[in-house]
Every structure is written in structure tokens, then in C-alpha cells.
């Protein structure tokens, strides 16, 4: 039986102490186009050959027995020149133990040029192997043909390039591996990060040439040298497809078709960016420009001569105009994170516009070189026609590629050419790199020295010193030097960005703008180099034992080994903020990590285990950091894939380049390395907590077909055969209606954290749907392997298990706790308000004939409102009636204490009710009664598919917008509250807060309004009325068997509180109903954060009803808290503030946590006893006072 249990996998890493002589692996480059994957041993060089054939396994075994027994190791770099769909990856199986001996797959690492890995094998053996594609769901797709067979020489370093399905291919001659101490980690993310040092290319005599970053990314045609002017227009085979294009995309594709050379293409980009005025159009222009320029700089969109004659100064002038516009866009107050992110990707694709390149005749050195008399005539002609004439007529990126190819050629053999000639050509090469902004980070930083003040120079010199020590240390695993270099880089980048943030004046001289471009490129280059440093650090961390060793250190209460990883993460998150992405969030995460780093792991925190509290607190922040990286990646996935596909198809870009574009952007960014570090640290934290990555929201057991969906949206779920299904859901916002989406849903597995007591959690519990979340990447991958299969989900507080089920698909029962409608909750039975309970007869919506509305104006009291103390179910709804009862209970609570002396006292905000019938009266006064009745009739049968239901809901909402709350009603409300009071307008429908239909969060609440602004107040009430007819509300009532005509809405108006904390209490633990615990979930600020299912976790406390013992179950990590501004307008809106939990008492003060937990437990137990059943309670903490704003029956 295939199973995903609750166990954790052990790490394959071996721990080595910091003082060990072992060093981090060093990365090397095989050729100028291939970057290699993770290395784990020191390199050796050789010139031996490799051959590849196909043979049978029996022959392989015979040959393996004959291998050389000398023990000499061979370094083999393998690249599979093949790309796969986003989310899939490539692995290999093989006969050698280093790749799993056919039992385990060995993953390859992604690069733009294919999938790569490095193996260290015993020399002399015969290696048999084969590639597989590992799908996103975990399934394997093997390449066809016989097993590949490779005869491994006795010693040396080699590389091979393979192609998918070509198992009998003749491999290219092996290339010797040259050393490059300047490259970071395993190479698979290194393609776009040749910024740390100059890219080194070996020549026959061992000389090293400094190559440009442009050359390292080139995917266009190789340089072709000519001895006459044969350039012409060689643009053959390209196709442009403008069908279906419009707007910016159409303009860009037509512009490319009419622009053969580089300067015309740059001018077209300038026109597109400058000509985009509207925000949406502007973002599109930036996105398409970034994609287009990237393809030009990598040679996938070629540039040719078109018969014109424009020196490079023309390109420089256009570049300056583009640069100014980008800086202007990003400096605007309303600049979006998306615009800033995309603009940063355009900068490295622009040429320099320094004074020497805007001169009338720039780059003249090549003319002098081409006319020297100390070089052969043929070489002179090749330089003249291939480089000089082309550069001065129609410069393009291909000129730098040709120059580097020529430089490598003339330096291959020492003494073959004049030393002065070679030296001058090298100088020209550096000038050309400078023009294309393709120099190394060191060269870029050197070029800006002249403009730096003493503080800047000090930061720059410190960075150079740290970098030099790191590069010459000879040990890539020198963690201390890595951390020092990271700190110095951060300091330097901060200095640069501070200067850049001063802005660009409209009257800034050209020289200042040119230097500003250098500063901008340097800070982008520093971010790229941090990617390299963080990658090296991750390798070092793995070498030292990785997550397993970190977890062991926590177990032994020695957490000093966590200091460097947390430092690295803080610095990495700081770099993301410096790049303009969620700066306040990055700052808060950094503050928290530093605070937790400084806190000792205590034996006890209050009455709780210090190790557990330390780990849970850190886990909350690590989850927050990983959420930051996920949101960044999600943004890239929203921005690029559809636009890359549109532009790529129209421009005839190879499908492989289109398919891998976004993955390359994600993997080449610092956010990718931060995500990897978070994954390692979270694994260590989970191991130390004994956690398995599961969180049980609703326990139980169920079976069904596992179906993967993006979200729970009615009408959008895939069709099934009619049997029970278990949903594997990528995202949720907490307001979803599960049964309304599909009546066959038996279970939900959500791949993000979610408050247990969110509206979604409450609804799932009421509907008896087993609900779990999972945040462990390894388990998620295993789960996806079972998509489409009939499985059994078992969830309890102690474990979660997902297994292939032996039960047949014919089984139609939804779960072991079959969903049933509580008939009694909708039955009729008279009771008075003081004995209000879940079985009230008034809790059932009243019935009405098809020709009349449920309530009439004669039901409305004088003045249009009812005092909260007088509210009852028939006139005001269950919520208002419960709040009225709460007000009377609040007085009694002041005299009640728990057995341990903890007070059960609480307060209730003052309030009034706009009763049932008020909406109908407003409809009548607006002459909209008949139109509304007609739409309501259509609503009963409207189909959710095809937009029919949405259209009718929209029409009803338009009717509601035209309504007005009577002036006498607003005047009455004004008299009931203080003059400057802020109010909240809440729903109190006859179809919510019932035992069989809690409708938690289904209807609107509008905060921060005041009757002193009648227009805003009236509009807020109408929004609450309209929320009765949203798509979700209609489908929810259908699922419960309630007619749309039977639904009506009263409005509860209460004093708006400004809480420090908001909470939801369940007086019976949802995860463990027999535990005699009150469970609380707490969020900073207003309670909407909890109720709506905002991404993140709340503080979670459990308090014993009898013993008063408080357990901390989780720490909060919501990114924002919602507040009501006391000085701003009463406009129905919140203020959002970023939360720093290192400053929140509930996180850092164990005594306060204990006291609050006991207080909430006492209040919850008091309410449960007085209401006579388990309660779902909402409230908040204002100063030292507990306020209760709502209590309703808790679904069990």
C-alpha cells in the first residue's frame, strides 16, 4: 500500500564541525556556455577521452568487473540539453553507487542550457545510466531507447552533453575542466550571475582572459569572421505573427519587424515605454520591454545591418532617455512593486551613455588596431570587417561576442602576435564591455569610485577586502568569511541605494545621469553577487550537517550553530527589501530573526518547555519569510508567463526559451536562495518540535478521489464521476463555501497555513468535512503523486495519514462523520429571549408566498431602530439577539471568577439594530420593490455556470446602491452614540448564527463609519443589505436548502473598538473535542484578520477549563494588522500596518501569555455555561478589558 505517513525523512548529510579541514566545494565552468551543478569534491584535470555506447545489462556487469582498481577518482560533468515544463525536473538513474545503483534517482540541477550535475566516479568503470523527467505529481517519464553506457577513463575531469531520447548518440569530445574560483555554488543557478568576478576562459597556454557577462549568457549564433563586407541583411528564417495582438504587444512586434539593427530596436523600446501613460499600459510596456531586451542581449533576437550608418553614440543617447524614464517611473509615489521589479530587469540590458560613448566618434581604438602594420593582412581584414566597420555602422551585442572570440584566438599561442597589438586589443575589449555594461562587478565598482565620498569609499574598500580574503582563502566553506562578506556587501549596497534614493533632478547634467546609471548597475550587481554568496553558504551549511544537525543542536539546547544561518537569512531578506520588494515586511522579518537569535534557549519559559517555545516562535518568523519568497515568485508567475508566451510566439522565439523564461528568472534571483535557506531551517525546526508538517483543522477519516485545484470556487472545480472527492488546494482566502462549491467534497488538504477558527475552518467543521493543511515540501510532493487516485485521509490531533484506499470508487458516503443537516436547528419551537439557544424556533427563516416579501414596513418601530437590550430573534436576527443577551451577561460576569480566581468579566460594546423590514421599506420608498421581487425570483433558479448567477447578483447590487436609509433612522442612531463615535455596521440575517447554518463571515461588516456623514453611513448599510445576495451567500443557502426569498437582513450597529488584540474562542477544542480545553486564536489589531483567513497563523492558546493550565500551540505571523485611524475620516476603511512581533507582548512575554490564556478560558467557560452549549465567541482586548462582540453556537 502506497502511503504518506507522519514520519520525517532523515538527512543524507554528515556533520562536520566548523573547525574541520573540509572545505566547501568549488564551482567550475566547463565552457563559456555551460554552468555546472552542485559540486561536492575537489577537482582534477585530465585530457582523457570518453565514449558512449548502448549495450545490455549483462555486458555491463562483465565490463564493470574489469574496471581499474586503483581507486583513482574521475570528475564527470553531465549536461542534458533538454527542458521540461515548469514544476517538472530531471533526474538520472544509473549503475554507479554515486547515482543510486538503479535504486534511487539522482536529481539534476536546472540551468538555462539544460539540466546539469557533477559526478565523482571510480576511474576505469563502465557507467550505465538513463534520464527521467520527474513530473510535478511525482510520476516518472523515462527516455526511450536502451540504457546509456559510458566508459569512464582511469583519471581526469570530463564533460559530456546528452540529448533526450538519443541514448545511442556519439558524445562530443570531452572538454577539460578549467578552474574558476570566482563562481559560487553548484552552478545550476549561476548562469545569470557572472558578476562576482570576471568570467575566466582558459587558453592553450594557460592564459586567462576576462570575459563579459554578456558572453556568458549568449545563445545566439557564434561569431563568424569575414575579410570583406559581407554583413548585409542575413535575417532569414524569422517569422512575425501579429494575429490576435493588440496594444503594446502589437506595437512591439511590428516595431521589431521594421527594425533590423540594435539602435532601431532600442528606439522602438523607448517609444513604447515613454508613450505608455495609463498605469496598466505602463506596466505592460515595462514587461514586454524587459522580455524583448533580454532576448536581444542573449542573441535570441538577432540584430543586423540595414544599410544605415549610425555610430554607437546614437545607441547611447537612446539608452539615456530610456534610463531617465525608468528612474522617473520608479521614483513616483504611486510606483507599484511590479513596476520597480520589472524596471530593474531592464537596466542591465541598456548600453552605457558615458561621455566617451556619446562623443561624435566613439570607440576609435578599434580603427587604429585594424590599421596596424604588425599583424597579418588577413587578420587585419577580419578585424576591420567583422568588428570595426560593423561596430561603427550598426553596433549590436553580437559585436562584443565577436570581439571576445577574436581575443581568445589571438591569445591562444604566446608570441604569435605582437605584444603591443594584443595589449591594445585587450584594452579595446574592456572599453567595449564598458559600453555594453557587461563588465564584472569589480570593474563596475571600480568605475564608480571617482564619484564616491569618504563614507562610500570606506564601504567599498571593506567589501573589496572581504571579497579578496574570501577568494584567496581556498576554502569555500569558510563560513566566517562568507558572513563578513555578506555584511560588507549589505553596507555598501545600503550606501549606494541611499544616494540613489535622493532622486534624479530634471536639470541633472548628462555626466551625472551617466554616473547614476553606473551606481544603479552596481547595486543590481551587488544583489546578484549576494545570490552567489548565499549559494555558497547553503553548500557550507549542508556540508556541516544541514537541517539534521541544526535540529540535534536544539535538542541538546545548544543553538549557537543557528547564529550564522539566521544572520545569512536576515541579510538575504534585507537585500530583497533594498530591491524595493515589501520593504516594511522585510524589515519586520529581519528584526524578528535578530531578536530570536539573541534570545537564549531557556529550560522554561513561564510554565512551558523553553525548547518548544523557542522553536515555535522561530518557526512563525521562518514561515513568514518563506511566505515572502512565495509571494515574490507568484508575482513573477503572474507577470511573465502569459506575456512571454504572447511575445515569444509573435517573434518566433524557440519554444524552449519561452517555456523556461520565468523559471530562469525565479531561479536566478536571490529570492530563490532565500527560499532554499528557509526550507532548510524550517525542516530543522519541525524536526526539533517533532512536527510532521501537518496541521489538523477538522479531524476525522474519509475516502475519495484526490483532485488538485487552485482554489475552492463554485463552478470552477473539475468534473468528477459523482463519487466523493478530496481536494488538494493550493490557496484559500478563508471565505470559501466548501459544500456550495461541490456537494461531493469529503475532505480538504490545503497547501498553506490557515487559522483553525477562520470562517472557512468553521464552515468545514459544520459540514463535517475533514480538513488539514500541509507546509512540508517533501510531503506535498508525495501527496501530488496520488492525485487522481482513490485515497483515504485519516486526521487526528496526533497524526495525519494519506493512503491509497482499498475501498471501491462506488462508495458514495462522504466520510465517517457523514454530513447531516441538523433538522432541529430549523424546526419551530417558541422560547423567550433569556433562554436563547441553538434550537430556537425563530432561528428558522420564515416562509413567504411567492407574491409577498418576508417583512413589511409595519414591523418597523418608531424611529427605525431597536435598542440592543430589546433585540430579539424575530425582529433583529440571532446575532443581534445574542449580543443583547451578552450585554446582560456582561453585568453578571463582573462577579464571577474561575476556581483559580481568574475573573470571567467582560464588556460588550453599545449598539442598536436596524430591524428586519427596513430594507423592504427602502425598496418601496425607492419604487424598486417590483424590480427586486422579479430579480429575486430569477435568483432561485439561476445557474452558477456561464455567468448567469453572477449577472443577477450584480443587478440586485445595482438596485441596492440606489437605496437610502431614512433620515429619521440615521438621526435616531446619532442620538444613541457619542457625537464623535466611530461605528461598525454588521450583518444580522435570519440565515446566520444558527446551529445548522452559522454562515460565518458570509455577510458584510463595514467598519469605521459615522452617522455624522449620512451619505457614507447609508451606503454602508446598503452594502450590508446587498451582501445577502452575493454569489457565495446564494450558493450557501442553496446548499442548506433555504429559499432565497426566505432570507432577510437586519443590521447591527455597534460602537467601533480599537483593540490591541482580537480573538476567536471555541469553548470545545475543534481538534480534540474530548480534551476539556478552551481554544483561542488571537491576531493583532481588528478581528477581520482572523475571520477572513488572511495568509499566516495566529497566536493559538489552549486553556484548561478545570485546571487553568495554558498551552501555547502556535505564535502569530500575520504580516499586517488592521486598525481604525482615530484621526482619519470615517470612510468605512481600515489602516494596514506591518507587524513586528519582536515588539508584541504576546510573543515575547510568557507571563502575559499565561494570564491572557487563563482570562480567555474563564470567559469562554462562563459563556458556554450560560448559553447552554459550546460557543464560537468573537472578541477583543482593549487595554486590560476583554470585550465580547459575538457568541453563537459552535459547530461540533
UniProtKB/Swiss-Prot annotation:
Checking SMART domains in the record gives: CBM_2
User: CBM20 domain: from which residue to which, for each copy?
Assistant: 66-166
Q: Which InterPro entries match?
A: ATP_grasp_subdomain_1 (IPR013815), Carb-bd-like_fold (IPR013784), CBM20 (IPR002044), CBM20_water_dikinase (IPR034848), GWD1_pHisD (IPR054481), Ig-like_fold (IPR013783), PPDK_AMP/ATP-bd (IPR002192)
Mention one GO molecular function. Answer: starch binding
GO biological process terms, alphabetically, are: protein autophosphorylation; starch catabolic process; starch metabolic process
This entry's comment on induction and repression of expression is: Circadian regulation. Induced during light phase and repressed during dark phase.
**Which reaction does this enzyme catalyse, per its entry?**
[(1->4)-6-phospho-alpha-D-glucosyl](n) + n ATP + n H2O = [(1->4)-3,6-bisphospho-alpha-D-glucosyl](n) + n AMP + n phosphate + 2n H(+)
Query: Segment Disordered: which positions?
Result: 174-200, 804-855
Miscellaneous section? The reaction takes place in three steps, mediated by a phosphocarrier histidine residue located on the surface of the central domain. The two first partial reactions are catalyzed at an active site located on the C-terminal domain, and the third partial reaction is catalyzed at an active site located on the N-terminal domain. For catalytic turnover, the central domain swivels from the concave surface of the C-terminal domain to that of the N-terminal domain.
What is this protein identified as? Phosphoglucan, water dikinase, chloroplastic
In which organism is this protein found? Arabidopsis thaliana (Mouse-ear cress)
